[in-house]
Amino acid sequence: KTEIGRVPLHRLEGIVCFSYPGASPALMGKCASLGVDLSFFSPQGRFLARAVGEERGNVLLRQTQYRIADSEAESCLYARNFILGKVYNARWVLERATRDHPQRVPVEQLKRTSAQLAAALPLIEQCDDLDQLRGLEGEAAQRYFDCFDSLILQQHDDFSFAGRSRRPPLDNTNALLSFAYSLLASDCTAALQS
C-alpha cells in the first residue's frame, strides 16, 4: 500500500474507516487509550460500529441522561432546542443563498420558505408534546428540502435533488446527506458518552 501521509494520533479526535479496510488490534488499543474514536462504515456509507475505550466515571452524567430520557417534559425541552437549532440553521442557509447568489437562486421561493420557517419557530418554542414536535420538525424539513435542489450550485447534473430518500439513498445527493448524518450520529454518540 502507498503511504498517503502521517498524522500524530494524539492530534486526532476520530478516525473513520470505509470499505472494510480493518484496523489492527494495536491501532484500536492505542486509539482507545488516547480517546480517539474509531468508526467503521460500509462501502455505501452505512454506520457499522464504533470502537471505544473504557468509559471512565461519569456515573452522574449517565444517571442524568436516563432521568431526562424517562421524563417527557425534560426530553421535550431538549428536543425543542435541537429542533429550534435545525430550523434556525435552515433559515440561515436559505437567507445566505439569497444574499450571496441572488442571480443563481430563486430568491422569491427561498425567501418564502424562509418566512414559513420563521413562522414555525414560535410554534416550536411553545410546543410541549414530543409527537407534535416531531410533526413540526417534519414539516420544516419538508419545506427546506422542497427548495434544496436550487441550493446546489456546482456540479448540478451530478448532484441534482428531487427529494429525500434513504435506506438506501437513491441518488448521489441523498447518499452524501445520509453519509453526513451517519458521521453526525457517530459524533453525537461519542459526545453523549464522554
Briefly describe each language-model feature range.
Residues 3, 47, 157:
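Glycine-rich, flexible loop/turn motifs
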Residues 13-19, 172-174:
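Conserved interaction-surface patches within small, structured recognition/assembly domains
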Residues 17, 30-37, 182, 190-194:
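Short, intrinsically disordered, mixed-charge
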Residues 6, 60-194:
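Active-site helix-to-loop segments that bind/position phosphate- or nucleotide-bearing substrates
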